[in-house]
Regions:
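Aromatic-anchored segments of alpha-helical transmembrane domains
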Residues: 20-23, 96-106
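Non-cytosolic membrane-interface motifs at loop->transmembrane helix junctions
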Residues: 39-46, 89-90, 113-127
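Membrane-helix boundary connector in multi-pass membrane proteins
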Residues: 103-123, 140-143
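Core segments of transmembrane alpha-helices
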Residues: 18, 53-62, 128-132
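Juxtamembrane helix-break-helix junctions at the cytosolic face
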Residues: 60-91
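Interfacial segments of alpha-helical transmembrane regions
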Residues: 3-15, 79-94
Length: 143
């Protein structure tokens, strides 16, 4: 197990984010999305992201576990990650996914007015800032 407190904080952020993703989608699918002012096709646009976000959540949890357990890379993993610990490589993969999804949300919310207060703009702003911030934290930590 890692004795580095920064590693544990990063791993905790990864797991909390993964749990946040799960809670978001559970709540999202329990909401009708018929509020006035939502852009045309909102539900059809958003629904497929459950798949990418689920993959992201799994990568975040696996990365966190591997980061704190200090598991040395197996020979097959060395081919993929060089000699970098696999948890760090997965952290960078998660960072790329977070960056992509955060920029996509930023562009979509800005284009469709979903940053306005009446359209849960505060929550949407928090999602984008949190997503992009964690991406930068992971990149700075593991590059």
């Amino acid at each position: 197990m890692s004795d580095n407190p920064v590693t544990w904080v990063i791993a905790a952020l990864e797991v909390i984010t993964a749990l946040g993703i799960a809670v978001y989608w559970i709540m999202w699918f329990r909401t009708p999305h018929d509020e006035p002012g939502l852009p045309d096709g909102y539900a059809d646009h958003e629904a497929p992201f459950v798949f990418t976000d689920t993959i992201l959540a799994v990568v975040l949890v696996v990365a966190a576990v591997l980061q704190v357990t200090d598991v040395p890379p197996a020979s097959a993993a060395r081919l993929v990650s060089g000699n970098r610990p696999v948890g760090e490589s997965l952290g960078l993969i998660a960072a790329g996914m977070l960056l992509f999804l955060g920029i996509l949300d930023l562009a979509y919310f800005a284009r469709t007015g979903l940053f306005k207060r009446e359209h849960e703009g505060i929550i949407n702003t928090g999602v984008v800032i949190g997503t992009l911030t964690l991406a930068v934290v992971l990149i700075v930590r593991f590059v």
